[in-house]
Amino acid sequence: MNLQYSGEQHIPAGLDRVWTFVTDPEQVGRCFPNVVDVSVQDPTHFDAVVQVGVGPVRGKFKLKVELQPDTAKRRLDMKISGGGFGSAVDMTAGADVVDAGAGATTLKWNGQAIARGPIAAVGGRVLDAQAQKLIAEAFATVRERLSA
């Protein structure tokens, strides 16, 4: 099942502070919803374990994440792959980090995912709604941590 998403998150923090945060694998990993563990491998790679629940499909997903920052363009791309309990997901996501003026920043993000296995069989609407919720939670966590 192929899924596509996009949106924006306004963050009341300056561009440099936001850029430093979103390119730090420890910080990014801790913003994943229902994260159980984050293990940083190097400055652009980390592993994460997240608790997943979509319909009757519940368990832990092990994810491998690669951050691909482009400092000149202020764009961060991510590749995420992994799975658990017979399901798998491959995702690409990106965010443009844009100066919104007055000490604020906007993250303009997009992503696409391919899900396979029991999690994909749950049904498009259920999976799509859950994925949208998780993405919104992740960006809300980024905003919350940078607003503190």
Model-assigned labels for residue ranges:
Residues 25-30, 55-59, 84-88:
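Short, solvent-exposed secondary-structure boundary motifs
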Residues 118-148:
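A conserved amphipathic terminal alpha-helix motif
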Residues 7-9, 35, 62-69, 80, ...:
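Hydrophobic/aromatic beta-strand elements that line small-molecule binding cavities or substrate pockets
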Residues 2-8, 45-47, 60-62, 75, ...:
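Intrinsic-disorder/low-complexity, polar/charged segments enriched in Ser/Thr/Lys/Arg/Asp/Glu/Gln
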Residues 39-81, 137:
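Glycine-rich portal/gate segments that line the openings of hydrophobic small-molecule binding cavities
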Residues 1-53, 148:
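Hydrophobic ligand-binding cavity/cleft-lining segments
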Residues 79-129:
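Beta-strand/loop substructures that line and gate deep hydrophobic ligand-binding cavities in soluble
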